[in-house]
Each structure stands twice: as C-alpha cells, then as structure tokens.
C-alpha cells in the first residue's frame, strides 16, 4: 500500500512537471526562439489581427489574397480613418533584433495595391513599409509611421516593373529602423522612427491590402529573425 502511494505521488509530480514544461513552451518568446534556432521562424507562431480573402502557406512562402477596400491610415491629410487591412504578426518582448522578409507583388495591378512589413500595435499606433502600385509608369516605395492616431507617409518613386522587394525591420528598445533591398543582401535605410507605444511587448509581421475596388495575391518568403543588424550609433554621445 505504501509503495502504491509513493508511485501515485511520483506520477502526480511528473504530470505537474510536464504541465509546467508545456506552459513554458507555449509562453516562449517567438523572437528569442528564432534567435536560438538559427534564425528559423515557425510560421505557426504568427497570428491574424484581421484575415484576408484567402491565405495559403506552402513551405516557407505565405500567399495572401487581399479583399477590396482594405487599408491602414489614420486622419492626416485625407481626413479618414481606415483600419481593416489584414495583418499577420508574431509578438515579442525582445528589445534588440531584426526581421527580414521578401515580398513578391507581381500580381498588383490597381492603384494603391500594396504589401510589405508592419508593426501593428493598435489602430492608432503602428508602422508599415511597402511598395504601393500607382500606374503603369511608377509606384511608391514608402513607409508610414502612425503615433497617437496620426499617420505620415514618406515615399520615393520607383519603376512600375519592379515586382519584388526585401525589407528589414530592426528594433533597438523603442526605436525602429526600416530598410529595403533589391537582392536581400544590400539594404538601404528607408526610415528611423520612435514609437511612443513601442517600448514593451510588440507585434510585427506582414500585411497586404487593396484600398480601392481591387484584389491581388502577395507572396511573402525567406523570412528570418537575426541579431539586430541596426548597429548602435558611433558618433555623438547621448545627452
């Protein structure tokens, strides 16, 4: 009888230990896990804020088909608030890292069709970077930063025949850097910004949308997490 009681207590102890281990695994930080596993990203750790018309995952590629009249913008200049673009993100408390992704928008064909990277915290605090189709001559490579419910937009015109773009999103505490690349090797700075709501846990990932009456399929691939590629400033010291 005594031995049976001991065995029962051991079984209960092991079960409790296993439950704690499962809980620990479930709560593992997504970025820290990727950094510990040769930069590989488990696509199953991404979560939708809003789902697209269609989504398909094959290998390391995510195909996202947009719905018409989907967008992200808050107030500035246009005086409207659009907050219904599909956003697929993972969350992290890691304060120093970089996220890289390749986008393919060969199917974009209508004004304002776009896809790229995003850090969507809530409707009034987010950033994004993308190529936005304009016409058969050119499109906009740009970024939007929204702090406290007001968006800005910084762009440069690129040829309309550009159909792929790489992005690198880097975090250093509550400051952020967005870079772009034509080949995934040589990156150029697009934007440095501060996010007022971006000091703690954040969510970041990918998005695609079609603000007007159109739809297209965007492809996202070659995603990875690395140590922060945005190096600390080596000039004037902080105040």
Model regions and ranges:
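Positively charged n-region of N-terminal signal peptides that target proteins for export
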Residues: 1-4, 19
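Extracellular glycan-recognition regions
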Residues: 23-239
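C-terminal motif of bacterial Sec signal peptides marking the signal peptidase cleavage site
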Residues: 14-16
């Amino acid at each position: 009888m005594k031995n049976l009681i001991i065995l029962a207590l051991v079984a209960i102890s092991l079960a409790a230990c296993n439950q704690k281990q499962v809980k620990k695994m479930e709560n593992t930080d997504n970025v820290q896990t990727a950094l510990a596993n040769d930069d590989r990203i488990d696509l199953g750790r991404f979560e939708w804020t809003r789902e697209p018309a269609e989504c398909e995952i094959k290998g390391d590629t995510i195909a996202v088909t947009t719905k018409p009249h989907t967008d992200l913008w808050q107030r500035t200049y246009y005086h409207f608030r659009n907050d219904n673009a599909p956003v697929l993100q993972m969350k992290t408390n890691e304060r120093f890292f970089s996220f890289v992704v390749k986008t393919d928008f060969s199917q974009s064909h209508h004004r304002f069709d776009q896809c790229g990277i995003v850090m969507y915290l809530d409707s009034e605090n987010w950033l994004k970077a993308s190529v936005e189709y304009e016409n058969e001559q050119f499109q906009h490579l740009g970024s939007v930063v929204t702090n406290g419910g007001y968006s800005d937009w910084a762009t440069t015109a690129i040829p309309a025949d550009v159909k792929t773009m790489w992005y690198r999103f880097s975090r250093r505490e509550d400051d952020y850097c967005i870079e772009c690349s034509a080949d995934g090797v040589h990156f150029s700075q697009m934007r440095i910004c501060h996010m007022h709501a971006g000091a703690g846990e954040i969510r970041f990932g990918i998005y695609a949308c079609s603000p007007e009456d159109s739809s297209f399929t965007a492809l996202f691939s070659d995603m990875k997490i690395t140590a922060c590629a945005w190096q600390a400033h080596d000039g004037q010291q902080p105040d």
